Amino acid sequence: MTGDIDREARRVQVEGTPGIDGIDFVEVIGNYPGSEGFVPRAPVQRTLLVHLLNDAVPADLDATRVSIVGGVRTDPTINPVRVVWAYPAIAVAGEAGSPTLPLPAGVDESDTRLVDGALPSSAAVRRRVLVVRTSSSGDWSTYLLRLLGAGGQGVPDGF
């Protein structure tokens, strides 16, 4: 997308409108040693929380349907930032801090604790969050996260 976008006006139009959804905001969980909520063995700045505006995360929204582009460093250990896994927050941390077992592929108990500590306890909020694990923390430049439609094309239905 290019040009000026009145993000707040767009958000107001989409929020609460039946049959249409969108990304409200993306949160990067820092998980720095010594910080409040630090979880040992959970990665630093590689867990993203993608908050949707209206509806629960679609069950078929997974790592193959999340794209991250951006970054300026040419170091292949940093860029491109790849999506390792992506699951609804309730699959990772449960609706009230106790996920259904077994945990999804690639997710461990430290991920559950990290995500649980970063989200409010509200089941309604947790249902609207997609958790994305990245291959690196990237660099300090701008990145764009996109949700893709079936087959990795376009946008998801209803977005």
Annotate each language-model stretch with its function.
Residues 1-159:
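Intrinsically disordered, low-complexity, polar/charged repeat-rich segments
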